[in-house]
Amino acid sequence: MTWTDFHYYSQQRGMQQIDALMHSRIANLSYAKYGRRDMQEQCGAGQHNNNRTTGGTADHGMTDTIGYDEAYVINNKITNSLIDGLVHQYAWYKSRDEYGQATVVQVNNICCLGYEDIYGNKYDMMDGVDLPNDSGNQGKWRIWMPDGSIRMVQGKKDSGQWITGVAHGKYMDMVPVGNLNGSSSTYYTDMYWISTATVRVVYRGCNYANASGGVSYANAGNDASNTSAYVGSRLAFRGKIVRAQSVAAYKAIREVA
């Protein structure tokens, strides 16, 4: 489905796609929680494909998965599968065996900050952001705020580099900046891809379990008409939440399409 179609159908349901502010907050909060930026080693990278079964972490609620290093300490016989020699495939949950001893359970999906596959599997086409790339705006992210105002944030113009810095600022924007090139294990441990052709939408999350694709990864190389089996998005809601008067009233709610 194209960005344009996903945007239309989500709006028809009173929803939107996950947006730039939401993704930035997820990244920043995950860094704050774990005190590191390499979320693929912290929470695992997941199975190395873009066709994972949704709901693989549902039985564990919002508990985050763990990565290879932490799982290995508990069980040194876990699957050791490196992707491109850089990142460990799969993720694990801490558990107990029948004798009460600590063990781990391997899963295909990752869960980071309570979000299943917030990176890997499929790209998230983001709402409320694009790169106009017109005169004077090369590489600038145009971000629509919840109140309708627009901010222009200058990002880096070099494509295919490992991220070494982000704009941050008042809104803690995860917009890649600078001209240095990092690596899969330094700085933000993820990559940025950009086209300076006019009007590019922005994807986050990456696909597969590539080392380049954690919570700070961004791809601003496609227009709104692009479609692919490994590109999708997430429904999100911004607005006023009203408490139902009763359980019966809540159950009586019907989707407005």
PLM feature spans:
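Disulfide-stabilized, aromatic/cysteine-rich ligand-recognition loop
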Residues: 1, 8, 14, 18, ...
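Short aromatic-cysteine micro-motif
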Residues: 1-118, 257
